[in-house]
Amino acid sequence: MVTRSEILVRGIVQGVGFRPYVYTQASRLDLRGRVRNSTGGVLIELEGKQGDIVQFVADLETNAPPLSAIESVECNHYLAPADYPDFVILQSAEEPGESAGETQFVPIAADFATCIDCLKELSDRSDRRYQYPFINCTNCGPRFTIIEDIPYDRERTTMREFAMCAECRSEYENPLNRRFHAEPTACHACGPQLFLSKAGSDNELFRSGGRSPLQEAAFRRLTNPASKQVANSGVLEQTRRLLLAGEVVAIKGIGGFHLVCDALNPEAVARLRGRKYREDKPFALMAASVALIRKHCEVSDEEESLLTSPCRPIVLLERKPSSNVPHAVAPGGNNLGFMLPYSPLHQLLLKDIDRPLVMTSGNVSDEPICFADNQASDRLREIADYFLWHDRRIHMRTDDSVARVHDGREIVLRRSRGYAPEPIKTALKFETQILACGAELKNTFCLTRDNYAFVSHHIGDLENLETLQSFTEGIEHFKRLFHLRPEAVAYDVHPEYLSTKYALATDEIARKIPIQHHHAHIASCMADNEIEGEVIGVAMDGLGFGTDGRLWGGEFFVADFVAAERIAHLANVPMPGGTKAIREPWRMAAVYLQHAFGDEFLNLELPFVKELEQRGWPTLRSMIATGTNCPETSSMGRLFDAVSSLLGVRSTVNYEGQAAIELEAMADRDSLGEYEFRIDDSAGVIESQDVIHSAVSDLLGGTPPAVVAARFHRGVARLITTVAEQVRAQRKLNRVALSGGVFQNMLLLTEAKWRLRASGFEVFTHARVPTNDGGISLGQASIANARIKSGRVN
């Protein structure tokens, strides 16, 4: 018997080849009807045998297009037949009675790596897109970085500047073609092209956004696709030769510019570091294949899956001792950050290069990545020797994402290209649309709607005008794309954060909700894991403004989404010089030594102490004694810095977390022993004197610093477990949430999770959003939502 069904599919189902897929599946099962994009997702009407319709739904749920993400399939079966003669794809339309400004909302896909089908065409000499650097289809290519407005069609992307040729138009309009309504569709004949120029040349022209006269003349001479293909190939061959000759090339990609050089050329690496003012922070690498990466790093099956995933993040991998990548690429660490080519341009560039390339963000240190041609020409001309340009505009800058595998699963450390703007689906219902402004460092913002949390791409450190502009532009773009009108704004309680000042100055949002930094960390972990109710929250990081006006960072809470009760914390110590103590960890080492030994520590026969007079200890001691510019802190991150400096690892740093990263790298994992913190149960204060005494005693006794480093890590893991056990005994809680930048330390995280699980705890850590401050905005939004729903906020 013939019956009819209506099926609404919600999720990331538009712009990802979903309607052609539905058309093909319906035709295969001899079903009639129609499919169209609706304001809620994709609406399908099917008419035929009920068994075939059931089979269609089953296939839909298990074998959807690769870039889609189905969140729900709502079926209304056994409707009266409409006698459809065939199956057709209809144009998009609003639902009757709906207001587009209020209800039209469909998640937008991220930018995804080149798919297998496009890669085959890229290398097929008989294909008309052979070696075309911008090949794409509905299963891959740019999305977020080229969208200017919605609904998502070519006229609202930067591809509107390229009129499709007849062949591309035919594919674009063919429901059975995988380029059906693939908005970035292009080819040699009608799409973007490559150009190579020496740094500093044609500078005025790039300011105006056009091509140079030379480029324009060359472009006009190319009258057919074959000659354009030859020209693009020639540009790429020239670029390869320049890189292998030791030059630094700024290459325009999908979300911005990279600064690129030969990773095996120490002189090129050193030159890039010097020009970029990036002394030690590790560079990312790109290699043509997993096989090439395996020459330099250990790669597990899970890590290979992550490397080859459509998101194509930079994956942190364990470096092999046999690797010939210069240590200057990633000084002081045991890891290398590798990614595979994710765009056809990268695929073609690396095709004949049997070595990794440095592929670092195209920016001056501390500034956001360059994405506009004129901006890159101005900012990067003193860093790059050459520029490899293309003429497809980037609308939204996006950095590479960073991830790693831990405990068998992916954990995201920087969520950007390939992940954003896809929303984080949560167990929470956001009845109020909220803007959460995030933290100062590693900033992201978050906007909410329904069950979605739109955590932004990585913005960076909000410490200059350029990054603040990127932050504000990003917020407006997300509001426009997802039809969001936030009614509340959540922000960090630190009064000097630029994100806080922005929130307080936002006049159009009256409801303002301050959120304590470390409560936001714990809430972020809870939202990431889709759990509710009270947890034992452990928040450890560099610092965050506490409710008592001090700088927190070694905190234990009993927390839920509404409130956080501070149960225990590291003892407060002075931070002489304020932020200067972050850049100069020796200051914290001196503080902790004085805290443990008094001024008698100056008699200790330690190399650190012998060098202290030259570093200005008398001035520092005076500052501590008088409290001059000495904010108090309970930060675990600062304690890691102190131990690192005490062991002679790092007395000054050039990037955030460097001292702790190098301390972790040098720790002897095969050694035995651990240090013990003293806990004042009545006050919940955790004293570190015994740890410092033990470390000094070991050093004086000839224990290698690598063993001391390992014992310190185990001591912190033991502390976490001990406090959690005490809280469990008092409060009958058995769930522990670990959050904060300190838990990027894999040695500590592994040890802490193992001990907690051995003690019977259920342990929650981050996966979908970073454990560092990049996840703060999700926590802020979750807390604000809970407080609004509970009536804690008017």
Language-model-derived ranges and their functions:
Residues 63, 156, 171, 179, ...:
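Internal gly/pro-rich beta-alpha loop/helix module
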Residues 492, 509-521, 734-739, 746, ...:
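Conserved phosphate-binding/catalytic loops in two-lobed NTP-binding clefts
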Residues 294-299, 348, 369-376, 401, ...:
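Conserved phosphate-binding catalytic cores of ATP/NTP-utilizing and phosphoryl-transfer enzymes
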Residues 250, 483-495, 731-742:
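Short glycine-rich phosphate-binding loop at a beta-alpha junction
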Residues 518-540, 544-546, 585-594, 718, ...:
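Glycine-rich phosphate-binding/hydrolytic loop that grips phosphoryl groups
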Residues 1-184, 188, 192-195:
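Intrinsically disordered, low-complexity, mixed-charge
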Residues 256-319:
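A phosphate-binding glycine/aspartate-rich beta-alpha loop in the early core of alpha/beta enzymes
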Residues 191-193, 439-477, 591-734, 747-754:
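A contiguous, well-structured pocket-lining segment that forms one wall/lid of small-molecule binding clefts
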